[in-house]
Amino acid sequence: MRNINFEDNYRVEFSIHPMREGIKRGHNIIWEFEEFSKEEIEVKMEWPNKFSQFIGDKAYGLIVADYLGFNVPQTTVIARNVAPFTFGKDTGIYERWIRTVPIVKEPGKYFTGDKWCDPFELMVQEERKGEKDINIASLLSQKGVEALYSGGAIIGNNESEDLIEGVKGKGDDFMTGEYEENLSDEVIGKLKEVMNKFRSHNKLLGTVSIEWVYDGKEIWIVQLNQIRNVSDGTVIVEGNVSSYEKSYVSEGLESLRDKIKTLNKDTGIELIGNVGISSHFGDVLRQNKIPSFITRI
């Protein structure tokens, strides 16, 4: 957007176009601008928004992380609405992951694979899982990462609000139920450096959660989400309800989704199983704002 080059004290309305438009035949059109007296303006990002839904929630979060300078595996977005584009860093691995990107986040519902498969057949299969006419905004072709450790983390306003969880190897099992706290000091140290860097952007991003992979040298960010409900200990979402209904991790994520659909307003969820707060189970409960806590067995 080279032609949108205004000082900070200007308000600018513009549009971005895949084809060249306007009298200057460019990809950006400026519709209106006006100058204001210079003053401090608080800038805060929030998504889902119209653009994140345009390319898919997961793709949008990774673009934000890449823009802010974090290690994001080299990613090509194959979207419905725009031509393919690539961002991120080379991981040194030539294997390709393929990841579906729903319009809005639906934790653990759609396919992520660590090897390439027919993307056209995949889209047909995954669309059938959704409840709308169109559920998938894009697919990601992503450079693989050598996963020595993987997991999730929540980055709060200060370190006392932080949460780190993970497992050895790939994070698929962790996100859908397997839980292990014993990460090495080296991994925790690397994670804390990355989390503090995210915290330096707190005014812009607010409280965020990440999915991460450690390859022995670097922490790679494979998902970035904003969260509205901060978890604490075994509590996923705080709230005052008259009773809690049991939901078992062993029954899977779809069972939890079905239970939420029929849950009374004055009822919460007791999630039973060895699962992490930053797992997809926790994501689903936070996203639906269901008062909930974990009972580990």
Regions found by a protein language model. Give the residues of each.
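Nucleotide/phosphate-binding sheet-loop regions of phosphoryl- and nucleotidyl-transfer enzymes
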Residues: 1-297
